[in-house]
Every structure is written in structure tokens, then in C-alpha cells.
Amino acid sequence: IDALPKIIENHPDIKVLVAGPGDPDEIMKDVDPILHPRITFLGLLSEDEKRQFFKSIDLYIAPNTGGESFGIILAEAMATGVAILASDLSAFRNVLEDGKWGELFSTSDSVDLARRASALLADPLRRQSLASQSSEGAKRFDWPVVAEQIMDVYDLVSGNGEKVVLASGNRAWSKLIRGRGE
């Protein structure tokens, strides 16, 4: 919310849609009243509404400041092929592969958020490129891919009584190795 005045100043025709939980009156009390007509609260969305929402926007911004263990909302946005700008939470960095599938801004830094959002909104070719990249990145989360990874883990842990250790601090399944220590 703190980044909105600068974003709107840079893009005076922008319409801001806010989806998710929260009391609009509580959120808007700290927003300059002159900006109120530019902001629409949609509340919680059904799965179909969420897909329509993502397909209707030029840029999805995920300004989360914590509490994300995976970042499923980013995977959902990626599947619709929308350009993404997200806070650099660990979960979001992992889903976006450190910026490969979308751009990141410093968590809780409204100046960085406003700067990066304004730059993306001013650059339709960059947004189009990010949208294509995010759509490609979403394929990692398709059910056949995930099911294959799950089967690989089952095969790995049930094989020959050998020990299994994790080779990565990020606990990705693809980093599991067989037969080394504890």
C-alpha cells in the first residue's frame, strides 16, 4: 500500500485490483483519499475467479512480507502466463528461481517495489517476456511432472535398504541422493 502513491504518480491511468483477505476500510485508512477511486478490493476469489483475475491483469504483484512456505499463489499466477513481481521471500525466490520466472523486489521495501513496478508497467515488452517465462516455469508444477517427482522419491527411499540423505539446504526432491552417510 505504501508503494501505491508513487506507482500511481508514475502511471496515472492505472487501476489497482487487490485480491485476498483483509478489511478494505482498515487497509484504506492509511491511503490518501484521492487514490481511493483507483483501488478496487475483490476479496477472496474462487479458483475460477482467480484464473480470470490473473488473465485480466498486466502485472501481478505479490507484496507478501512473510508466512509463505511454498508460494502456491505464484505457481497459480505463472500457470496463467502473467508477468510477476514478488517480494524476495525465500519461498518466492524458490518458486521464481531467483528471478528467472518473474522479478523480485526487496521485502517490505516500498521504494524498491514502486521503482520495479513502475519500470515493468512502462515496459510492455519486458512484461510480455516475463509472462512467457512464467508460463514456461509453471510447467514444473504440472501434475504429471510432480507425480513423477513423487514416484522418484518413493523409488529412492524404498530401494535396496540403502541410506538416503538430503544434499541441499532447500530440501528439493531433485537434490536427494542415495547411499551416502546419514
Predicted regions and their residues:
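A short, well-ordered alpha-helix in the C-terminal region of glycosyltransferases
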Residues: 112, 126-140, 152
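Short alpha-helical donor nucleotide-sugar binding micro-motif in glycosyltransferases
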Residues: 44-45, 52-57, 72
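C-terminal alpha-helical cap of glycosyltransferases
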Residues: 143-181
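Conserved acidic donor-binding segment of nucleotide-sugar-dependent glycosyltransferases
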Residues: 98-99, 103-110, 119-124
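Short hydrophobic beta-strand element within catalytic cores of glycosyltransferases
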Residues: 59, 83-86
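Short alpha-helical segment that forms part of, or immediately flanks, the ligand-binding pocket
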Residues: 51, 74-79, 90-94
